[in-house]
Amino acid sequence: MDTNNDIEKRILELAKQQVSPIEYENYLSQLKYNPNASKSDIAFFYAPNMVLCSTITAKYSALLKEILSQNKVGMHLAHSVDVRIEVASKVHVSDHSNINYKATKSSIKDSYTFENFVVGSCNNTVYEIAKKIAQSDTPPYNPVLFYGGTGLGKTHILNAIGNHALEKHKKVVLVTSEDFLRDFLKHLNNRSMDSFKEKYRHCDFFLLDDAQFLQGKPQLEEEFFHTFNELHANNRQIVLISDRSPKNIAGLEDRLKSRFEWGITAKIMPPDLETKLSIVKQKCQLNKIILPEEVMEYIAQHISDNIRQMEGAIIKISVNANLMNAPIDLNLAKTVLEDLQKDQAEGSSLENILLAVAQSLNLKSSEIKVSSRQKNVALARKLVVYFARLYTPNPTLSLAQFLDLKDHSSISKMYSSIKKMLEEKNPFVLSLKEEIKNRLNELNDKKQH
């Protein structure tokens, strides 16, 4: 007669043969056979929480019935067997104290705190929500998603939450979606998913940057879905950062969009001139650089919205003044900013331009490469041409092949169309131009590093 452990093992082995590895890891491997409640015509199983219980019942109860009806698991069963899956009243929880959550400190930037986050009307709501999250012992809102354009302080606020939570001796994981994917694939290939789950599903604060990059990766979305469910079911704080609202993340599964909106969503707006000037002054103080008031005002007025670019401009002005042994004045600032903005965008690849335009218009890159009558796609193709003409060498032939244009004269028409809209100060296109430039600068920065 087989032992209860043998029976459970055999059931799971048979189930494992009929589902994908990721399905088995995320669902069926979580089941525990309950011999005390089971009878000849009904088999009871435990799942660790209600989310898994409901999911396994809906997706896999028929499979389990089929396995049991084959009567190959060493049980005395009736011809027809029912399956019941319940939430365990007392699920054995392993000791997670040995997980080195302190190691995640290296992924959290000490310099990003609430104390040095410049607050203005553009970000006050996000700041207050973030402080409340960090200071609370239980999640006041869950999940929380902050979104907004590049360089507006989203990563700063995420790190500030992490730093404050660490001061309270909380277990914190801060990770980008790219690193989450890399870690997931490593553990999957090494068949060490248990340690992956230990790390990500048992922290007090799960902080994810660049959540928009989860889209289009089915395995990653599947794993994140279950990580999210378990964290949420166990009342662990989830904070997500994205460059756009959940509904505008093209290609993201609807079930993830839905979960992202369960709690609270808040947008970081571009800073107004007063806030930008405060940021410039703070960055000067942090970098121990003294600039005349008129130079700080000029930087605030002429750097669009990107805080990282403001800091880069401050440092470059100071360096140039030292190298030239010249005073820091308005003329120097104008020269440096003109060169800086030109340098940041020059050398952009067509791929980066395409990606920046696609992200700004919430399209897939593949959609833009094919001619279409859809207005947003047609506009996107014109914008790719415009930026390619500005920032890539000899773009005509490359562009024709890249966008599948048979007539090279089309490139001139598309470029002229955007140029005319900018000259007419079309507000939508002007806004798009700044957003695309910011995204290009960020993509180019990543390439350099």
Curated annotation (Swiss-Prot):
One of its GO terms (cellular component) is cytoplasm. ATP binds at residues 151, 153-155. Residues 107-321 are annotated as: Domain III, AAA+ region. It is found in: Cytoplasm. Residues 1-75 are annotated as: Domain I, interacts with DnaA modulators. One of its GO terms (molecular function) is ATP hydrolysis activity. It holds the Pfam family Bac_DnaA_C. Signal peptide: none annotated. Residues 75-106 are annotated as: Domain II. Its main location: cytoplasm. GO terms for biological process: DNA replication initiation; regulation of DNA replication. InterPro entries: AAA+_ATPase, Chromosome_initiator_DnaA, Chromosome_initiator_DnaA-like, Chromosome_initiator_DnaA_CS, DnaA_C, DnaA_dom, DnaA_N_sf, P-loop_NTPase. The keyword Cytoplasm applies. Residues 322-449 are annotated as: Domain IV, binds dsDNA. Keywords: ATP-binding, Cytoplasm, DNA replication, DNA-binding, Lipid-binding, Nucleotide-binding. Domain I is involved in oligomerization and binding regulators, domain II is flexibile and of varying length in different bacteria, domain III forms the AAA+ region, while domain IV binds dsDNA. Belongs to the DnaA family. Plays an essential role in the initiation and regulation of chromosomal replication. ATP-DnaA binds to the origin of replication (oriC) to initiate formation of the DNA replication initiation complex once per cell cycle. Binds the DnaA box (a 9 base pair repeat at the origin) and separates the double-stranded (ds)DNA. Forms a right-handed helical filament on oriC DNA; dsDNA binds to the exterior of the filament while single-stranded (ss)DNA is stabiized in the filament's interior. Oligomerizes as a right-handed, spiral filament on DNA at oriC. NCBIfam families: DnaA (TIGR00362). This is Chromosomal replication initiator protein DnaA. It comes from Helicobacter acinonychis (strain Sheeba). The lineage of its organism: Bacteria, Pseudomonadati, Campylobacterota, Epsilonproteobacteria, Campylobacterales.
